[in-house]
Structure formats: structure tokens, C-alpha cells
Regions:
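Formylglycine-dependent sulfatase
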Residues: 1-235
Length: 235
């Protein structure tokens, strides 16, 4: 993972840095509001069905605060904090949004497969879009690069919520071959982590190419630890 290692070496590494919750939605609510998840109204995961409740519009997010001071704001990637116009990213302070609103998707079909009914879940600024067969993390990197380039002359805040290494573990074929001698399921997880590292490298490369590194703060963290679920090959 050379790109993640470089971020750690060139930056400050926090060894006592805690996520707000052990599952996705409450942790993300804590991250975006700075409040304990229960106080933010998110004690557990938000429903992944359209119309279910999510992060209340009355909660003030970091995107709203940054926007109020003149920053362009973007959400790229996983949301998992609501599926209504009021609770989706554009209703929570983000000028631009691209990604999936539910907890997870297949990275190529962009369908939500957690439980039935299975449905398509890919959105740009509140409108459903279709990018059949395109690897979602690569789409994220491309969308992020466009946003950065368009806003390079002014301050911007980007919430780049990478869905890797969340299941389903769909690493690049070259990494699956590279780790073929590792025992299952470490081979799958290692391939997905190396895939994640490549995507992070593309994002940082964009920042460097545009000469923005000195004026950009990159914070790298996870919303929680690894999963022991069957879908995650029991950890």
C-alpha cells in the first residue's frame, strides 16, 4: 500500500484516534456533525430504502459550516445517512454529490444486494444515473478529479467516502493474481486493499498535478473496524 504509506510518512499519524461508532451510519453522523451519534439522532444504521429516515436536516454538518465560509463542498462515494431529498447530501450542505445512498453496492452494476428487493443505487446531485459496468471506485476518483479541477481557484471541502474495503470484495484482477498464494479470505481482502491504495493514489496525484498539495489538508480515516459478517467472509 505505497500511497497510504506515503500519506502516513509525510503527515501526522494518530495512534489514539477513535471512530464514533462500530457501524457505518452513526459513525458517519458523528464525523459530519461532531456530535455523539445518539445526540445526532443516528443510534444505528439508516434504512437503505427510499423514504426511510436518516440524518435530520436540523443537524448542522461540517459541509454546511464550510459552505457558509465560502468553500465549495462535495460528497463523493458512500452516503448511508438517508434517502430523501432532505437527508441526501445536497440537502445537508453539499454543493455536489456523486455516489450511492445505501450501505453498499456491487461495484460494477451499482445495485444494492443486502436484502430484497435488489435495486440500482447510483446518484448525482439527487438524480439517478447509470454507469453500467464501470468500477465504482474509479468513477469516484474521476468525479473527484473533476470537482477539484473545477474548484482549484477557490477553497473546497471534499468528503471522499471510499466504499473500499467494504464488502463485496471486488479487487482488481491483477491484485487477485498477485495474492493468489495467500490463504482465503486474506487473499480477497489484500487484493481489495491494494485496489483501494491505487484509487487513493489517483486522488493524491490529481492534487499534486494541480499544484495544490501545499494548500490541501488530507485526512485519512475509517468509519469503523472490520466486519465479522458472513458477507465479509467472517472477518
Amino acid at each position: 500500500t505505497p500511497n497510504m504509506d506515503t500519506l502516513a510518512k509525510r503527515g501526522v499519524r494518530f495512534t489514539q484516534f477513535y471512530a464514533a461508532a462500530p457501524v457505518c451510519s452513526p459513525s458517519r453522523a458523528g464525523l459530519l456533525t461532531g456530535r455523539y451519534p445518539v445526540r445526532a439522532g443516528m443510534p444505528g444504521n439508516a434504512g437503505s430504502t427510499k423514504g426511510r429516515a436518516g440524518l435530520a436536516p436540523s443537524e448542522v454538518t461540517i459541509a454546511e459550516m464550510m459552505k457558509a465560509t465560502g468553500y465549495a463542498t462535495a460528497h463523493i462515494g458512500k452516503w448511508h445517512l438517508g434517502y430523501t431529498p432532505q437527508t441526501m447530501p445536497n440537502g445537508q450542505g453539499f454543493d455536489y454529490s456523486f455516489g450511492h445512498m445505501g450501505g453498499c453496492i456491487d461495484n460494477y452494476s451499482h445495485f444494492f444486494y443486502w436484502q430484497g428487493p435488489n435495486r440500482h443505487d447510483l446518484w448525482r446531485n439527487g438524480k439517478e444515473i447509470f454507469e453500467d459496468g464501470k468500477f465504482f471506485p474509479e468513477l469516484m476518483a474521476s468525479e473527484a478529479a473533476k470537482f477539484i479541477e473545477q474548484n482549484r481557484e477557490k477553497p473546497f471541502f471534499m468528503y471522499f467516502a471510499l466504499n473500499v474495503p467494504h464488502y463485496p470484495y471486488q479487487g482488481y484482477a491483477k491484485w487477485l493474481k498477485y495474492y493468489k498464494d495467500l490463504p482465503y479470505p486474506r487473499n480477497l481482502y489484500a487484493a481489495f486493499l491494494s485496489t483501494q491504495d491505487e484509487v487513493i493514489g489517483h486522488l493524491v496525484e490529481t492534487v499534486d498535478k494541480l499544484g495544490l498539495r501545499k494548500d490541501t489538508i488530507i485526512i485519512f480515516q475509517s468509519d469503523h473496524g472490520h466486519s465479522h459478517e458472513e458477507r465479509a467472509h467472517f472477518g
